[in-house]
Swiss-Prot record:
UniProt xrefs under HAMAP family: Nfo
UniProt cross-references to InterPro entries, sorted A to Z: AP_endonuc_2, AP_endonuc_F2_Zn_BS, Xyl_isomerase-like_sf, Xyl_isomerase-like_TIM-brl
PROSITE patterns recorded: AP_NUCLEASE_F2_1, AP_NUCLEASE_F2_2, AP_NUCLEASE_F2_3, AP_NUCLEASE_F2_4
The protein's name in its UniProt record: Probable endonuclease 4
Disulfide bonds: none
GO molecular function terms noted in the UniProt entry: deoxyribonuclease IV (phage-T4-induced) activity; DNA binding; DNA-(apurinic or apyrimidinic site) endonuclease activity; phosphoric diester hydrolase activity; zinc ion binding
Similarity comment text for this entry: Belongs to the AP endonuclease 2 family.
NCBIfam families: nfo (TIGR00587), PRK01060.1-2 (NF002197)
Cofactor: Zn(2+)
Residues binding Zn(2+) 1: 75, 115, 153
Cofactor binding note of this UniProt entry: Binds 3 Zn(2+) ions.
Organism whose genome encodes this protein: Chlamydia trachomatis serovar D (strain ATCC VR-885 / DSM 19411 / UW-3/Cx)
C-alpha cells in the first residue's frame, strides 16, 4: 500500500472556490498567498456529481504546475453518510464515495476528507461498523497504489455524529487501515466543541499526547484551522476567524511552531472569504 510522504515544507491554505472550474480553486489559492488548498470536486449538497472530463483533468493539472501548490485536499459532499442505517442512503453514499475517490485519483489530489457518519436512529456502535465497511469497500480503487490518502475529519459531537472522540476514530482506523490508506484531519473548532481544550499550549500538549496514545500521531495528516464561536464542549460547529473566537490566536501559533504539527498541511475554513484568508495566512506565516 502506498504511503504518502510528509511535505518538505510547512503548507498553509484555505478552502477556495471551484466556481467556473476546479482549476480556479488553485488559482484563488495562489492569489491569497497559499501553498495548498482544499476544494469541493463536486456540488457538496447534491447526490449527482458532474462527470469529470479529460479537459477538466488537464486544466487542473496545468494549474497545479503553474501555481506550485501541493498536497491538495478534496472535501467530500455533506450528504454522504458512510454509517447510514437507511440502506438507500448508505448505497448512495458508497456510490458517491467511489466517484469522489476515483476523481481525486484522476486529478492528482493528495487527500480526500470525509465526515465519518451519523447513527441517526441506530446505535453508534452499528454506525461505526457500517462506516468501516463503507470505506473498506473502496479498496479496489487503491490496487495500483495511487498517491491518495483518505482522511476522517474530527466532528463536534452534535446530534448522532460519530468521530467526535479519539477513541471512535481509533476504532474506525483499526478497521479500515488494512484496506485503504487512512488518516485523520483534525478540525480545531470541532475538537474544541467536543471538549478537547486546545486554548493554551498546556492544553495542546495534553491533547496531542492523548491523540498519540489512542490513535498514533502518524495518522494525523492534516488540520482544519478554525476558531470557535462557542465555548469549550458545547458541541456546536460554528467557525470564527483566527483569534476572534474562544480558542484564541496563541493556539494557532502553537500549531505553526510545534515540531509535531508544523509540517502538517493546514487549511483555513474561517468565514470571511479570500480577503480574510489572505490576512490570516500572512499572520500565521509571519507573526507565528
Amino acid at each position: 500500500m502506498f504511503i504518502l510522504p510528509p511535505p518538505q515544507e510547512a503548507l498553509l491554505g484555505a478552502h477556495t472556490s471551484a466556481a467556473g472550474g476546479l482549476h480556479n480553486a488553485l488559482y484563488e489559492g495562489r492569489d491569497i498567498g497559499a501553498t495548498t488548498v482544499q476544494l469541493f470536486t463536486a456540488n457538496q449538497r447534491q447526490w449527482k456529481r458532474r462527470t469529470l472530463t479529460q479537459e477538466m483533468v488537464d486544466q487542473f493539472r496545468i494549474a497545479l504546475n503553474e501555481t506550485s501548490l501541493s498536497y491538495i485536499m478534496s472535501h467530500a459532499g455533506y450528504l454522504n453518510n458512510p454509517g447510514a442505517p437507511n440502506p438507500e442512503i448508505l448505497e448512495k453514499t458508497r456510490v458517491c464515495m467511489h466517484q469522489e475517490i476515483a476523481d481525486c485519483i484522476s486529478l492528482g489530489i493528495s487527500f480526500v476528507n470525509f465526515h465519518p457518519g451519523a447513527a441517526l436512529s441506530d446505535s453508534k456502535e452499528s454506525c461505526l461498523d457500517r462506516t468501516i465497511a463503507s470505506f473498506s469497500q473502496m479498496a479496489p480503487l487503491f490496487e495500483n497504489n495511487p498517491p491518495l490518502v483518505v482522511l476522517l475529519e474530527t466532528t463536534a459531537g452534535q446530534g448522532s455524529l460519530i468521530g467526535s472522540s479519539f477513541e471512535e476514530l481509533a476504532y474506525l482506523i483499526q478497521g479500515i487501515k488494512a484496506h485503504i490508506p487512512i488518516g485523520v484531519c483534525l478540525d480545531t473548532c470541532h475538537i474544541f466543541a467536543a471538549g478537547y481544550d486546545i486554548s493554551s499550549v498546556a492544553g495542546w500538549e495534553q491533547v496531542l499526547k492523548h491523540f498519540d496514545a489512542v490513535i498514533g500521531l502518524s495518522f494525523l495528516r492534516a488540520i482544519h484551522l478554525n476558531d470557535s464561536v462557542f465555548a469549550l464542549g458545547k458541541n456546536k460547529d460554528r467557525h470564527a476567524p483566527i483569534g476572534e473566537g474562544c480558542i484564541g490566536s496563541d493556539s494557532f501559533c502553537f500549531l505553526m511552531q510545534d515540531e509535531r504539527t508544523r509540517m502538517l498541511p493546514k487549511y483555513l475554513e474561517t468565514p470571511g472569504g479570500p480577503d480574510l484568508w489572505t490576512k490570516e495566512i500572512r499572520y500565521l506565516q509571519k507573526v507565528c
